Regions:
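Catalytic core of the metallo-beta-lactamase
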Residues: 1-56, 95-185
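Accessory terminal helices/loops
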Residues: 2, 161-171, 178-242
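Active-site metal-binding motif and surrounding structural segment of the metallo-beta-lactamase
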Residues: 41-85
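Glycine/proline-rich, flexible active-site/cofactor-binding loop segments
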Residues: 62, 90-93
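Glycine-/small-residue-rich active-site loops that bind phosphorylated ligands and cofactors
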Residues: 66, 90, 148
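Short loop/edge segments at beta-strand edges and connector loops
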Residues: 85-87, 99-100
Length: 242
């Protein structure tokens, strides 16, 4: 079972639940905090105030409202917060555009991330990765992947290949709690997969299933187990109709 708090090298990673199934991620280093994809400001403000955490930065993976809807209110409460995100003219606030190959260091912390562009779910989608953690928004889910609202199947397949090449012990922090439904679909097309069946059994009574390890995604996630773009397209369409 994964705990509600992931501790590593004096950095805590804490899930903040929002809406029906969203995860907003708080990366805490001492009394400094970084928020990933704050779709709703209220639970974030409650957590920051309760723990007396100073919000240093906001990381945006993509433009959907359930990932950015709380940003303006957070700016009102923390006017000096630094915001990073993909290039998008629709954002109504100032932020630093980051692209593939960029690296960011959050001021006042030791937190550093590299940027990878992952078009598919949306064309502007990016992910943030360091040696041990991946914040992937709606590109990769536990045992699943994001729906294609803008990108092509080939674009999404190539985006997932980028993620697949990361270290197997990378912890994967996605934007939604879809794991159990995703496992049901995975079992419908890969019923004899021992690791997948074990994952299903292990998570039956677990409420928060994130983070997962990239290694277990490589073993059980049908969208990372395909051999080419055409296979990905076929399975993605089957999932859309599941």
């Amino acid at each position: 079972m994964h705990s509600l708090l992931t501790q590593n090298n004096n950095i805590n990673i804490i899930p903040i639940k929002a809406f029906k199934d969203n995860y907003i991620w708080l990366i805490q280093e001492k009394l400094n905090g970084i928020i990933v994809d704050p779709g709703d400001a209220k639970p974030v403000l409650t957590k920051l105030e309760k723990e007396t955490i100073n919000l240093k930065a906001i990381l945006i993976t993509h433009k959907h409202h359930d990932h950015i809807g709380g940003i303006e209110e957070l700016i009102n409460n923390y006017p000096n917060v630094k915001i990073y995100g993909p290039e998008n003219n629709q954002f109504g606030f100032k932020y630093q555009i980051v692209k593939e190959g960029d690296a960011i260091t959050v001021s006042g912390t030791k937190v550093k991330f590299n940027i990878i562009e992952t078009p598919g779910h949306t064309l502007d989608h990016i992910v943030y990765v360091d040696k041990e953690h991946l914040f992937c928004g709606d590109t990769l889910f536990a045992c699943g992947c994001g729906k294609l609202f803008e990108g092509t199947h080939d674009e999404m397949y190539k985006s997932l290949l980028k993620i697949s090449s990361l270290a197997p012990n990378t912890k994967v922090y996605c934007g939604h709690e879809y794991t159990k439904e995703n496992i049901k679909f995975a079992l419908s097309i890969d019923a004899d997969n021992y690791e997948l069946n074990e994952r299903c059994r292990r998570l039956q009574d677990v409420e928060i299933t994130i983070p997962s390890l990239l290694q277990e995604e490589l073993e059980t996630n049908p969208f990372l187990r395909v051999r080419n773009s055409e296979e990905f397209k076929l399975i993605r369409k089957r999932k859309d109709e599941f």
